[in-house]
Amino acid sequence: MMVRNNILPKIRRHGAVLVLAVLVGIIYGSHHFFIVRELGTNGGNYRPLTFASHADASVYGIRANAVYYGQWLAGDISVPEQSGNPSILPLLNPMLMGGLGRLLGSLDRALILSDFLFPPLIFIGLYFLAFELTRRRALAIFFATFFIFIPEAVLSIPPITRSLLHTLLQRILPNASDILYFVRFEYPKITFLFSLPALYGLLRAIRWDTDERWSTWLAGIFFGLMFY
């Protein structure tokens, strides 16, 4: 009962971010429905990840596919003679996506579900990270919303030169054909799931007005997982 009394007020206090997270998931995942509908009228088959979708697919996609078919330690499988050697890339990212595919019975389903699930989780993490820094819900929501859709624009802030201003305007008003930033995997759609909790836990742990142990554990666990 005490846990319930402590959790419910916090949920109500931050309820808006949960509603917005659902909207983020719909926006990030909606393109799958539009593409399927378009292909359906033309008799095509839909694959959510192709080499044409993004250059990263040539490396990351085949690693997730290898895990899906049972090779849990997916090394540099794009080069046959290196496939059995230690991986120079993190192993946990393809394990997460490939394992989700095995759970759902299809890697395509895993890729589609990840667009509905992972960006909202990242959005919530961004919100609580910003709230920890500002203690203002409105500012935290603004930052999380801004970052989840146009994170690269942050690199041009403040626009103190004409070049930075031009770059900022380009990134705020992207091309309609560009993919959303957190659709890409492994980076940043999966890697942010580990870096955000690590940073949030670190901020909580170093606050002078708290002696929480869970924040130290959170920072330590996810900081360690970032290397895998």
Language-model segment annotations:
Residues 1-10, 207-218:
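Membrane-interfacial, low-structure loops and terminal tails that flank and connect transmembrane helices
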Residues 6-20:
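N-terminal membrane topogenic signal
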Residues 12-15, 137-138, 212-214:
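Membrane-interfacial entry segments at the cytosolic side of transmembrane helices
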Residues 18-28:
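Hydrophobic membrane-insertion alpha-helices, especially the h-region
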Residues 28-197, 227-228:
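Active-site lumenal/periplasmic loops and adjacent helix-entry segments of GT-C-fold
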Residues 190-215:
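Membrane-interface transmembrane helices that cradle and orient dolichyl/undecaprenyl
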Residues 214-228:
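Membrane-interface alpha helices of multi-pass inner-membrane proteins
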